[in-house]
Regions:
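Short, well-formed alpha-helical segments that are part of the catalytic scaffolds
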Residues: 14-29
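Hydrophobic helical membrane-anchoring modules
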Residues: 1-3, 149, 173-263
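A short, conserved beta-strand element in the Rossmann-like catalytic core
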Residues: 41, 65, 93
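Short hydrophobic beta-strand elements that form part
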Residues: 8-12, 59
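Acceptor/aglycone-binding surface of glycosyltransferases and processive sugar-polymer synthases
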Residues: 60-79, 84, 96-179, 206-215, ...
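A conserved acidic beta->alpha catalytic loop
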Residues: 39-47
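Donor nucleotide-sugar binding loop of glycosyltransferases
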Residues: 16-19, 42, 95
Length: 263
């Protein structure tokens, strides 16, 4: 546990039956207070496994998409008093053991957002990332950095940590329900002056790891460029106004009220 902070891990799941248990097994329980798994209408045993593992399990009755899944993740995390929310893909592509490092970056007060980068340690290709995806990742990142005035190593990681303030300030409901949601979050956060930090994260690419096909990758790339252009650095900064209605905004947790992770 992190003093004075309730840490909640959220797992946006879709057909994750083969990797969910391995992912959860490596999440550091001495750091995480609760784990939420949101299933996006999977047709496999993801839900049954999540419940067997004792996770807080939310099930969509229809597929809402990757971004739609994350919206539910963050809403549920805030509703149980999360101060720090760490989003981790449950496909075992990223190392769950680094969750504590990401949460500590947020708890330090130096960063509002922390990213687990596959590029910093040059582990993407070594871990099996297809060459065309690596080239596209690097190319998109260069353009995004130029447009929004950042020096991030990548914008496309599925391993992220946020402060409560970030999640309450960004207009998440207006963002895409597709994969470009991740970039919309980061660009909107930069435009509001939130500080972003990174750590290197080794990754694994294998048959069960989630991925998108070439056609959707092209659509995603175009969406990323459009998002960066809309939030380019010459555009005016936006205020950090809480967009969540007051009646839906639960109070931040207090240390004495912290609940431990259910077995």
């Amino acid at each position: 546990m992190i003093e004075h902070s309730r840490v909640v891990a959220v797992l946006p799941a879709y057909h994750a039956e083969k990797t969910l248990e391995r992912t959860v097994a490596e999440i550091p329980r001495d750091i995480v207070d609760d784990i939420i798994c949101v299933d996006d209408a999977s047709r496999d045993d993801t839900v049954a496994i999540a419940k067997r593992l004792g996770l807080r399990t939310i099930v969509h009755d229809r597929n809402l998409g990757y971004g739609g899944n994350q919206k539910t993740c963050y809403r549920e995390a805030l509703s149980i008093g999360a101060d720090i929310v760490v989003m981790l893909h449950p496909d075992y592509q990223y190392s769950p053991r680094l969750l504590g490092a990401l949460a500590q970056m947020i708890a330090s007060g130096h960063y509002d957002i922390a990213l687990g980068s596959r590029v910093l340690a040059q582990s993407a290709l070594a871990g099996g990332m297809p060459l065309y995806k690596y080239i596209a990742n690097r190319g998109l990142t260069v353009v995004e950095n130029l447009l929004i005035g950042q020096k991030l190593s990548e914008y496309h990681t599925g391993y992220r940590a946020f402060t409560r303030e970030v999640l309450e300030s960004l207009p998440l409901a207006t963002f895409s329900n597709d994969f470009v949601f991740d970039n919309e979050m980061l660009c909107a956060a930069v435009r509001r002056g939130f500080a972003i930090g990174e750590i290197s994260c080794p990754t694994r690419y294998f048959a069960e790891a989630s991925s998108i096909n070439f056609r959707r990758s092209v659509r995603y790339g175009l969406g990323v460029l459009g998002t960066a252009w809309q939030n380019a650095r010459w555009r005016p900064r936006l205020p950090r106004e809480r967009v969540m209605p007051a009646e839906q905004r639960p109070p931040a947790s207090r240390p004495a009220a912290r609940a431990s992770q259910r077995p």
